[in-house]
C-alpha cells in the first residue's frame, strides 16, 4: 500500500493511495447483487459457484477453505458486513467477489447484526503481507457509513463494481 506522506504547517497527512490492492483483484463478473441465501453455509456455497464459474476454481475448494477459516472465528466485521476469506493452495494471485444478499443472514458478527454485504477473498497460501493489506483496505472501505449505504442501495452491478474499484481512502490527519 503505497502512501505518500506530506508535511504541511507542522501537521502530517496521509495522502491517497495511487492504486488499491482491492481494485486489482475484483473482476466485474464477481459482483453479484440481491442473491437469495438463507444461511452462511449457503452463502459460502454460492461463493464457490461464483469463483468456479468465473475463475475456474473448484467450488468445493472455495467453500471448504472459507469454512475452515470461519471455524477459527467469525469474519463478520459488523454493520452488516463480512469478509469471509481463505487460503487456496496453488492460487497464483488473490481474487475477490462481492455479494449483496437480498436479505441479511446471521453471521456471529461482533455487533450481533446480521450480514447483507459479503466480500469474499481468496488468497494464495504463501501470501501474508498482501493478505493483511487487502483485509485492512476492505475494513477501511466499509467503515464508511455512506459507502455502505451506497453498496446496499445501488441497483446496478456495473456501477457498484466501479464504485468498489475506484474507492480511495479519505485524507486523514495523523498528527
Task: Describe each PLM feature range.
Residues 2-175:
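Cytosolic covalent-transfer regions centered on His/Cys nucleophiles
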Amino acid at each position: 500500500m503505497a502512501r505518500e506522506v506530506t508535511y504541511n504547517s507542522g501537521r502530517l497527512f496521509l495522502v491517497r493511495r495511487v492504486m488499491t490492492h482491492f481494485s486489482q483483484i475484483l473482476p466485474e463478473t464477481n459482483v453479484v447483487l440481491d442473491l437469495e441465501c438463507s444461511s452462511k453455509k449457503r452463502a459460502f456455497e454460492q461463493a464457490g459457484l461464483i469463483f468456479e464459474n468465473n475463475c475456474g476454481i473448484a467450488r468445493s475448494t472455495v467453500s471448504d477453505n472459507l469454512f475452515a477459516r470461519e471455524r477459527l472465528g467469525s469474519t463478520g466485521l459488523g454493520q452488516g458486513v463480512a469478509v469471509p476469506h481463505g487460503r487456496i493452495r496453488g492460487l497464483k494471485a488473490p481474487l475477490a467477489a462481492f455479494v449483496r444478499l437480498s436479505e441479511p443472514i446471521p453471521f456471529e458478527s461482533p455487533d450481533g447484526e446480521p450480514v447483507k454485504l459479503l466480500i469474499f477473498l481468496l488468497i494464495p497460501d504463501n501470501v501474508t503481507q498482501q493478505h493483511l493489506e487487502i483485509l485492512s483496505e476492505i475494513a477501511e472501505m466499509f467503515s464508511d457509513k455512506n459507502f455502505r449505504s451506497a453498496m446496499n442501495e445501488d441497483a446496478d452491478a456495473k456501477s457498484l463494481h466501479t464504485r468498489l474499484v475506484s474507492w480511495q481512502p479519505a485524507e486523514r490527519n495523523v498528527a
